[in-house]
Swiss-Prot record:
CDD domains: Radical_SAM. Transmembrane segments: none annotated. Pfam families: Radical_SAM, RlmN_N. It comes from Caulobacter vibrioides (strain NA1000 / CB15N) (Caulobacter crescentus). One of its GO terms (biological process) is rRNA base methylation. Disulfide bonds join C132-C368. [4Fe-4S] cluster binds at C139, C143, C146. Keywords: 4Fe-4S, Cytoplasm, Disulfide bond, Iron, Iron-sulfur, Metal-binding, Methyltransferase, rRNA processing, S-adenosyl-L-methionine, Transferase, tRNA processing. This is Dual-specificity RNA methyltransferase RlmN. The keyword Cytoplasm applies. Specifically methylates position 2 of adenine 2503 in 23S rRNA and position 2 of adenine 37 in tRNAs. m2A2503 modification seems to play a crucial role in the proofreading step occurring at the peptidyl transferase center and thus would serve to optimize ribosomal fidelity. Its cofactor is [4Fe-4S] cluster. Its EC number is 2.1.1.192. GO terms for cellular component: cytoplasm.
Length: 404
């Protein structure tokens, strides 16, 4: 016996299907050429006027900082209405804002349900102040000294979500319009959650937007991208972004770096150094920054300091020495201050600038290693971290000369 089902018949009591609404594209994440294309493809602006309109809209978003198309007074009302129907320029939700006694500011930003990242503004770093931004939600690197870096990768951030971190900071710092002479935000460091070179396409677009002179206008020489050493992507990073390069080094030999930075097993030190030496634009005016966390009895001996000098010989560089901030369950301790100073003295004698940076924002849990343990007690669903280097003050006082 066969049975035939008539699937065309639906009960009159059945609820109608809910249409799936496609999220609006956030124009804040589009470079100017991408913005031109989006305006034409959407039919909001005719081709002949698209370039002019794109520049107007771009300036309103990134120079004036508006969050509503209705505020774009030199754009026709009809065009503004069509823009609002097709796109958005809204900011993400700020879940939490904290300000440290030392002026450090931290924002917990919800990009989407379950997608939260932290950004930190550190005053007095670089020319005026630096913002540490994230490029991914979660991380795949599993660096053994990093409490927060062991969290699983959720997804890459979009260019709009990266740029939004800058916009949120500028909102809070009252930094609009972007050409204010007394701006407090002068530098951007990609040292938050994630490995930027595993999301280079979106990172590169964000850098183009942030550095565009019609908008936020932060020079590419004041934008630093930190990597644990994704060697095949170094050349592309330099050629497409012209950003300053920072390397999370932390060891001078492969056996130790394999433990501290497991990515080293894939791209060992010799390969990493070759990639750094070939980095586009590397010069005394565009030095690479080596980040080196000071771990007691692990990588802090005078022999290690001399090995570091030998390793980077001939590379225009500076070394940021970062005191380790212990976290519960960690196998590591911070080097004694005298040990750190002795390490720095060896580097300085060899001609390398080697500032020692102490953590900033400890009272708002913005110091290295505090973010995962303390934040998860409050909000277990949030997957976020800020890099060790940024919290220790990635840029030294002499960076103003390099990034002017």
């Amino acid at each position: 016996m066969s049975v035939t089902l008539d699937l065309s018949r639906v009960s009159s009591d059945a609820a109608p299907a809910t249409p799936v609404t496609k999220p609006l594209i956030n124009l804040s994440g589009l470079t100017r050429p991408q913005l031109v294309a989006a305006l034409v493809e959407s039919g909001v602006v005719e081709h002949g006027k698209a370039k002019m309109r794109a520049t107007q809209i771009f300036r309103w978003m990134h120079h004036r900082g508006v969050t509503d198309f209705a505020d774009m007074s030199d754009v026709a009302k009809e065009t503004r209405a069509r823009l609002a129907e097709a796109f958005t320029i809204a900011r993400p939700e700020i879940v939490e804002r904290q300000v440290s006694k030392d002026g450090t500011r931290k924002w917990l930003i919800r990009m989407a349900p379950g997608i939260e990242v932290e950004s930190v503004y550190i005053p007095g770093v670089g020319r005026a102040g630096a913002l540490c931004v994230s490029s991914q939600v979660g991380c795949t690197l599993n660096c053994s000294f990093c409490h927060t870096g062991t969290q699983p990768l959720v997804r890459n951030l979009t260019a709009a979500e990266i740029v939004a971190q800058v916009q949120v900071a500028k909102d809070d710092l009252a930094e609009w319009p972007s050409d204010k002479e007394d701006r407090q935000l002068s530098n951007i460091v990609f040292m938050g959650m994630g490995e930027p070179l595993y999301n280079l396409g979106q990172v590169a677009d964000a850098i183009e937007i942030i550095s565009d002179n019609e908008g936020i206008a932060i020079s590419r020489r004041r934008i630093t991208v930190s990597t644990s050493g994704v060697v095949p992507m170094l050349e592309k990073l330099g050629s497409t972004t012209q950003a300053m390069l920072a390397i999370s080094l932390h060891a001078t030999n492969d056996p130790l770096r394999d433990v501290l930075v497991p990515l080293n097993k894939k791209y060992p030190i010799a390969e990493l150094m070759a990639g750094i030496r070939a980095y586009p634009g590397l010069s005394n005016a565009r030095r690479v920054t080596f980040e080196y966390v000071m771990l007691k009895g692990v990588n802090d001996s005078p022999e290690e300091a001399r090995a570091l000098v030998k390793l980077i010989k001939g590379i225009p560089a500076k070394i940021n020495l970062i005191p380790f901030n212990p976290w519960p369950g960690s196998d590591y301790q911070c080097s004694d201050w005298a040990t750190i100073e002795a390490f720095a003295a060896i580097l300085n004698k060899a001609g390398y600038s080697s500032p020692i940076r102490t953590p900033r924002g400890r009272d708002i849990l913005a110091a290295c290693g505090q973010l995962k343990s303390e934040s998860e007690k409050v909000r277990a669903s949030a997957l976020r971290k800020l890099s060790l280097a940024a919290m220790a003050g990635v840029l030294s006082d002499d960076d103003e000369d390099e990034t002017a």
